Amino acid sequence: MPILLFLLDTSASMNQRSHLGTTYLDIAKGAVETFMKLRSRDPASRGDRYMLVTVEEPPYGIKAGWKENHATFMNELKNLQAVGLTTLGQSLRTAFDLLNLNRLVTGIDNYGQGRNPFFLEPSIIIVITDGSKLTTANGVQDELHLPLYSPLPGSELTKEPFRWDQRLFALVLRLPGASLVEQEQPPAVQFDESPITAMCDVTGGRSYSVTSQRILNQCLESLVQKVQSGVVIHFEKSGPDPPILEDGLTDPVRSVGSQPWHNCHKLIYVRPNPKTGVPLGHWPIPESFWPDQNSPTLPPRTSHPVVKFSCTDSEPMIIDKLPFDKYELEPSPLTQFILERKSPHSCWPVFVANSAKYSELGHPFGYLKASTALNCVNLFVLPYNYPVFLPLLDDLFKIHKNKPSLKWRQLFENYLKTMPPYYIGPLKKALRMMGAPNLMPDSMEYGLSYSVVSYLKKLSQQAKVESDRVIGSIGKKFPQETGIKVRSGSNALSLALRKDFKQLLQEITGEVPQRPMDLNMKEFAGFQIALLNKDIKPQTFRNAYDVPRTNLLDHLTRMRVNLLRSTRQFLKGQDEDQAHSIPIVQMGNYQEFLKHIPSPLRELDYDQPRRLHTFGNPFKLDKKGMMIDEADEFVSGNQNKHKRTGEPNMQGVPKRRRCMSPLLRSRPQSPAVINNHIGGKDPPISVNQVSPDLPKPVAVHKNTDLSNNATVNEATENHVADHFCDDLLITKSEPFGTLSSAALEATEGYAAEKDSNFRPNDISDVFLENTKETGDNESCLPNNNAAFTHRKRRLQQCRSYEEANIELKAQILKEIRKPGRKYGIIFTLLKDVQGDLQTRLLFLQNVIQEAARFKKRNLIEQLEGFLEEIHRRASQVNHLSSC
């Protein structure tokens, strides 16, 4: 995942215009967008991460960092303005610290345990500047200086502020202000002579001198090709030059003095695995010191390892199944020199100075070798001191047949003493892959000293805190100054040098009365000049001089209208059309507008206690359309105790169940209608399709009046009947309706009086008597009990018996929910059920189901006995009528 960090010079000098009419800052913004378009052509660009840094003071200069998305990056890029100084050194340090923010947390640098090229975070910093003088608060600088102090923990472990996988490139804008005759340009873009060029060379990058738009596009295409995964290594020649060329003659030119290929600061490509997309490797590049277990700290390392190569030709050594790493070198004078020798079968060993314990140069850890096709040069990384180790391995497998002798073990132990201890882990893994896992004991492990481990762990924790602080500060705006401080231009004179010195002495001694103090604003320490706030519009009605000359007549008319208008209304400082006139750039900024409008939903009232379930598990979620089926099994007599999952209802209609009543079984299959449509718009549903089941428990509305049509619309019931009122409109599907509070109180009072001498079987006669069909305009039957007079009066106002049954079921449900075993009022209310016998039986079935939901077993037994009595008497009536 390459990281592309753009460092844009936003100093005041970027406001200068080119011959194209655009400012340098606009050209820089366009260059960033063009680079992103060119980069998007590569499929590997999906994992790119873009960051944006300016030359403002940290942390305000960080516009887009680790957490910001692409939209934030583009928005911050468009809003950049060219103000301030050219503090390029401080901004570069900020950019490097931003890239190194998480390296200690992830352990990618692997301090003290070798450098792993396959542990990398490739980053490219692209600086776009005008190449003018570097200005700071202390003055003008001729050279680029990066601050030595860094607030980032662990920065002392590396001498330079950058790392070996970070490269710096600079686009120095040199576009003229006047159009010139375009001269013939050289084929290659020239380096720039600005101070940033030296910094680019140190990191492995380069600078570009941009003199025209065509060269800018050429530079951007070159930068896109520079986005490669790799690390920078400093190659340095050790020893004499190769004496003989391919033709057998010496080269007199290259044998005198230092040549460019003697010291190269170039990149080695670390290709990611095509399957995983992550680079893989086996062997590290050795450290430039021998690790000491007694050392409390680690010596600081250089950003780029210094790899020395010897020009002595040797044969490349490779053993079957031995893992090795192969890295291609970036084209450089060194690769050109090696390829010109045309010797693909010879190699030059490479070393790291002071990596061995007793040798200054160290032992070889790999070699440089030209490819067979002579088109590139590769760096092969092998085990440390491979000229000694590889012959030992060859003898082990070919001569000893993987059974080492005592002499071989002694040679192997001597080799281990010359190898840095951080090679133990990779060597164990390699031997395991080759089929010799027991050569090195498991007890042989390498680890840093306890003090170093504690130190690194402490640095990692501090780096995590610093990372959170920096990430949290990104996006904050620089605090605007309230005013410009005024300083006195001339130094204050001594009192003895003032002309009125004698008069001042007389005032102090009291000889002369004191003069009033003259207010001199220049001597006031806190005097400031207010800055003009562009966001605040001038109040032109306060100051006539703020009104433009072209708007005087319009402004006078507006002030006259406001003067004659009633004082109850707000004054208007602008026309209504002008209030909606905004620049085109701000028309699409909906997010800022949405922040100022009130929320359509009110805030939650946290003071009110949250309503819990009144039945069952209080932690159970309210599942819509889910039913508890244990009650069904209890009523139907099924002894299966296993729960089954309920099914969602079709438009609130429960799943069909087998009817328990023999009268209902023998009922002809006439399609009854279920009143479950909403607002009376949906078609009625046949009973052949669905049958009533346990209704869904919902809240029962209080203080409603069924005499009003609105109340009828709120009280609905899954009720089955043969005939329905055509004009009955139900607008809300609920299981039960409600009675008025007066009727409920009257019913409860009657139940308290009559419950002592209640007998359920006495009601069966009354329940069975009302068997005649009820029409649409049929009124409810009156009851002789005086306690129910008020309720009966309300029932007589109902337009159909369905509404009366809705009221009854609401009352019965309320009685079922009450604790205790006094069920007299329930059976009393059952006498008032209206409709034919089939409707009454279905009503009774629903009551039994509700009782089962609340586990009222005693009530269920009485209701079932009541149902059997009705069946028995109904059969007697049918027998007498048949006779």
Curated annotation (Swiss-Prot):
Pfam families: Beta-barrel_INTS6 (PF25462), INT_SG_DDX_CT_C (PF15300), VWA_2 (PF13519)
Family annotation (InterPro entries): INT_SG_DDX_CT_C, Integrator_subunit6, VWF_A, vWFA_dom_sf
VWFA domain span: 3-227
GO biological process terms on file: protein localization to chromatin; RNA polymerase II transcription initiation surveillance; snRNA 3'-end processing
Keyword Nucleus: yes
Disulfide bonds: none
UniProt entry tagged with the keyword GTP-binding: no
Motif Inhibitory loop: where in chain: 626-633
Chief location: nucleus
PANTHER family: DEAD/H BOX POLYPEPTIDE 26/DICE1-RELATED, INTEGRATOR COMPLEX SUBUNIT 6
Domain notes for this protein: The inhibitory loop acts as a regulator of protein phosphatase 2A (PP2A) activity: Asp-629 and Glu-630 residues mimic phosphoserine and phosphothreonine residues and bind to the PP2A catalytic subunit PPP2CA active site to block substrate-binding.
Subunit structure: Component of the Integrator complex, composed of core subunits INTS1, INTS2, INTS3, INTS4, INTS5, INTS6, INTS7, INTS8, INTS9/RC74, INTS10, INTS11/CPSF3L, INTS12, INTS13, INTS14 and INTS15. The core complex associates with protein phosphatase 2A subunits PPP2CA and PPP2R1A, to form the Integrator-PP2A (INTAC) complex.
Family assignment from sequence similarity: Belongs to the Integrator subunit 6 family.
Function: Component of the integrator complex, a multiprotein complex that terminates RNA polymerase II (Pol II) transcription in the promoter-proximal region of genes.
This protein's name: Integrator complex subunit 6-A
Organism, as annotated: Xenopus laevis
